A protein has these predicted regions:
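Class I SAM-dependent methyltransferase Rossmann-like catalytic core
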Residues: 33-61, 65
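A short glycine-rich, Lys/Arg-flanked "PGG" loop and its adjoining helix->strand segment in the class I
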Residues: 85-86, 159-172
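Class I SAM-dependent methyltransferase SAM/SAH-binding core
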Residues: 74-133
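C-terminal lobe and adjacent flexible extensions of AdoMet/dcAdoMet transferase-like proteins
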Residues: 251-271
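Conserved beta-strand signature within the Rossmann-like core of class I S-adenosyl-L-methionine
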Residues: 173-181
């Protein structure tokens, strides 16, 4: 998975402000957003995660619209993709870049299905040559989104490169939306983000070093129950529940009661 993240930059290079406010109000809801979230195309297991991931509030906060070209970086199994696809299929465009599960690849291949005309950009290490869709927007995307991936880039040593690539991917005035597991600010920064948590100040610094400006931050994905001191890191919590079998009886109830991790939700603008 980590190897697939470096080539994202090659794709981003091909795609061609408001002052920072502490907690801005979300933009008006696109008409089709709630319909996409409530739609029958979604996996029932994914719906169960809405209580922790707040897709309606999160995407509204980022200011998504149906007519945008949106890049989702490292979509994985497509938790957000199955919302973004129906939302953008008529007037906009969805580009999925980086690692994607076989099931998500199959859904992209079915152009008549849930993801419609979505494009999956594939990469071929070690030369990272891009096999891209010639119809993709050359002047840049309206929005780049990434959900719970920054710790992987830190661990791989590619975080500055990826943020620089995301900056090049969006047009001036374009948006970068980031959701990430949030570290305890009282603890030292872990240079490898080994437990999956990242300091909010780190993410802001990475984005600003690439050229973005922080537009707003939201607490919509905050979880004050998360103590962030788990032996297996963030993966001890749902949905992974990576718990030592010898400790499972004791720790599983705690993990389930906590829910998913405490997360930062940050919106950046390209000047």
């Amino acid at each position: 998975m980590i190897k697939a993240l470096l080539p994202v930059v090659a794709m981003l290079l091909l795609l061609a402000t408001p002052s920072s406010t502490p907690f801005a109000q979300p933009a008006p809801l696109p008409a089709g957003l709630k319909a996409a979230i409530d739609g029958p195309q979604r996996d029932p297991a994914n719906r169960l995660r809405d209580r922790y991931r707040h897709p309606l509030e999160t995407l509204s906060f980022f200011g998504i619209r149906e007519d945008m070209t949106v890049i989702e970086i490292s979509p994985g199994a497509g938790w957000y993709s199955e919302i973004l696809g129906p939302l953008l299929r008529e007037k906009g465009k969805l580009i999925l870049a980086g690692s994607a599960s076989p099931a998500l690849r199959a859904r992209v291949a079915d152009q008549s299905g849930m993801l419609g005309k979505a494009v999956l950009l594939d990469f071929r290490p070690p030369d990272f040559s891009l096999k891209s869709d010639p119809t993709q927007t050359p002047q840049g995307a309206d929005m780049v989104l990434t959900f719970r991936n920054v710790h992987n880039w830190i661990s791989a040593g590619t975080v500055q490169t990826v943020f620089a690539g995301m900056f090049r991917a969006v047009k001036p005035g374009g948006i970068l939306g980031v959701v990430e597991h949030r570290a305890n600010p009282a603890l030292p920064v872990d240079a490898k983000a080994a437990n999956g948590y990242v300091h909010e100040t780190q993410v802001i610094a990475f984005a600003e070093a690439a050229g973005f400006r922080l537009a707003a931050r939201s607490e919509v994905n905050a979880n004050p129950l998360d103590t962030k001191d788990h032996a297996a890191g963030v993966w001890m919590l749902p949905p992974t529940l990576r718990i030592d079998p010898a400790e499972r009886e004791k720790l599983l109830p705690r993990a389930l009661a906590t829910g998913e991790s405490d997360r930062m939700t940050l919106k950046f603008i390209k000047p």
